[in-house]
Structure formats: structure tokens, C-alpha cells
Swiss-Prot record:
Active site: H188
Molecular function in Gene Ontology: L-malate dehydrogenase (NAD+) activity
EC code(s) of this entry: 1.1.1.37
Official protein name in the record: Malate dehydrogenase
Coiled-coil residue windows: none
């Protein structure tokens, strides 16, 4: 029984992630079988012919839940009346580019997107940032959407969490469903901390089940941190299908109450939890309870965990300070 309709903006919709994503949204995998979908697809002007091809394919799938497709290069039109803004598109880092260059280029993009969301999106809009560097891009967009409550902005560490769960399951020789409470702390970058001490395998600490601290501290952590680069090296381009899958999973987490005993990783605006500076977009362990997103409290760190936590926190502080110095934050 159809009981809802949602309008979704996807930026960079003709890119590899967008192409892997939009069909899954239209099929009902993101919002469920009882929610009709309208897609507002945004691309740069030169990519509009390719985007029209994506729209043709969406039509040809004859998805019963897909009720409307808008293809546009007009940011304001793309954000008009949307309930969800999936900010997938961003400028990738190129050889010889400093991180500050990347932050400045994308800062301009996400400034405009935040303003358009503020002025044109639905009053209940939620914003899910994927384009990298996603934590700080999310911070910039949030800063320029003053009328949208800050707790409606999220950035994605879902792919990192899924990568980490898979590595633990393989090492322990268990099914992927046995691995729970796998937290990614901090930044979606090579400083992220995949917290194997607080992760569970069949309800027991992963560090106890695997009992190979050298592998966990060195191989596991670095594999998760560097997985994106490894995919690029292997296939010649960045993660696309797995990123799209993680977007589906991440939004599922945000629209569905979390089962008892489970949690998920999500970047959200800090309110000071775990000593993180208020206002930073930081990945925490989260639960959705009765429609409200909450950070899981009272997890503990040993010296190794605290050091990794502080490293990723300091990187996010540095990114914030950089974009502030560039005039991208108030």
C-alpha cells in the first residue's frame, strides 16, 4: 500500500556513483516498497546529454514507484521541494593538487549547494553528503543553509563501516551478519579509526575473537583506511557500485529505527560527544530510536584507540581551520 512520496535530489547524477545509485533509489531500495519517488537529477551543462540517457534508461526500467524525473544543470531547480538531497558530485583530487586547493574548489561548490537547499528545498529536507572531502563539504553546506536544522546534515562513513565489517568477518571466518557495532570514528579519510575493540563478532569483542592484535592494529586498520586507493589501483577508477550501495544502506539507517544491540557509523554535527569540538562533522556510532538519531555513549578507548581518535579529530580541526581561513565558513 503506497503511503508516502519522497522527492530526492542527486548531484553528479550521470557520474559513476550516480549511475549506480539512481536505479536502486527508483526501484524502492532506499525508501521501501510503499514510498513513491521523484528524482531531481543534477549535472554540469556538458554532461546533460549523458544525463538524458540515464533518464531514458530509468524510463525503460518501468519502475512502478518512480513518478517523476527532472534532469537539469540548474542547482535551484534541482533542489526545489526536495525531501532528501544526496550530494554525490564533487571535484576529485588531481595529481599535484594540495588538500587546501581541493577544499577551496569544493568549498565553492558546496557553498552554493547549501544556499540552494536553504532557499528551495522542502521544510523537512535532509542532506547526505558523499562527495569528498565529505565531512568538511558537509560542514560548508550546513554553514550556508542557516534555516535548515544542523541535525539534518550527514556525511557518509557507511562504506568504510561495510569495508571494516567485511575484513573482520573474513579474518574470523564468520558470516558478515555476525559482525555488529563496527564504528568508524572521525573523518572519511586515511586517518579514520575503524574501532575493532568495540566492534562485536557474535556479541564478543572482535579483538577477543580474532586474538591477533598485530593483524588488527596494522593490517586491518590500514586495509580499511586505504581501501579506496586500493580499488582505484585495481580497477583504474574509484569505488562506484560499492559507494552507491553504501548510500542506500546509510539512508536506510537514517529512516529506519535501529534493531536492539546494533549501531551504525554516521558523520553528524558534534554536540561535544566524546570531547569532539562542537560543530565539527564527525563520524560517531549512532542509533535511530523512535525516529531520532542518537550518538551511542560511554564507549571506552585504550591508548591505541585514543591516539587514533585524536589523529582523525585533529585532521578535521585542520580542515575546518583551512576552510575558515578561505572564507568558506562564517
Amino acid at each position: 500500500m503506497i503511503n508516502n512520496r519522497v522527492r530526492v535530489a542527486v548531484t553528479g547524477a550521470a557520474g559513476q556513483i550516480g549511475y549506480a545509485l539512481v536505479f536502486r533509489i527508483a526501484s524502492g531500495q532506499m525508501f521501501g516498497p510503499n514510498t513513491e519517488v521523484e528524482l531531481n537529477l543534477l549535472e554540469l551543462e556538458p554532461a546533460l546529454p549523458s544525463l538524458e540517457g540515464v533518464a531514458m534508461e530509468l524510463d525503460d526500467c518501468a519502475f512502478p514507484l518512480l513518478k517523476r524525473i527532472v534532469c537539469t544543470a540548474d542547482l535551484n531547480k534541482a533542489m526545489d521541494g526536495v525531501n532528501w538531497a544526496l550530494l554525490v558530485g564533487s571535484v576529485p583530487r588531481k595529481q599535484g593538487m594540495e588538500r587546501s586547493d581541493l577544499l577551496q574548489i569544493n568549498g565553492g561548490i558546496f557553498t552554493k549547494q547549501g544556499q540552494a537547499i536553504n532557499d528551495y528545498a522542502s521544510d523537512d529536507v535532509r542532506v547526505f553528503v558523499v562527495g569528498n572531502p565529505c565531512n568538511t563539504n558537509c560542514l560548508i553546506a550546513m554553514n550556508h543553509a542557516k534555516d535548515v536544522p544542523s541535525d539534518r546534515f550527514y556525511a557518509m562513513t557507511t562504506l568504510d563501516e561495510l569495508r571494516a565489517r567485511t575484513q573482520l568477518a573474513k579474518k574470523a571466518g564468520v558470516d558478515i551478519t555476525a559482525v555488529t557495532q563496527m564504528t568508524i570514528w572521525g573523518n572519511h579519510s586515511a586517518t579514520q579509526y575503524p574501532d575493532f575493540y568495540n566492534a562485536k563478532i557474535n556479541g564478543t569483542s572482535a579483538a577477543q575473537v580474532i586474538n591477533d592484535e598485530t593483524w588488527l592494529k596494522e593490517t586491518f586498520v590500514s586495509t580499511v583506511q586505504q581501501r579506496g586507493a586500493a580499488v582505484i589501483k585495481a580497477r583504474g577508477s574509484s569505488s562506484a557500485a560499492s559507494a552507491a550501495n553504501a548510500i542506500i544502506t546509510g539512508v536506510n539507517h537514517l529512516v529506519t529505527d535501529t534493531p536492539a544491540g546494533e549501531s551504525f557509523s554516521m558523520c553528524r554535527r558534534s554536540k561535544g560527544e566524546y570531547g569532539v569540538d562542537e560543530g565539527l562533522i564527525f563520524s560517531f556510532p549512532c542509533r535511530r530510536e523512535h525516529g531520532e538519531l542518537k550518538v551511542v555513549e560511554n564507549l571506552e578507548f585504550n591508548d591505541f584507540g585514543r591516539e587514533r581518535f585524536n589523529t582523525t579529530l585533529n585532521e578535521l580541526r585542520s580542515e575546518r581551520d583551512t576552510v575558515k581561513s578561505l572564507g568558506l565558513l562564517d
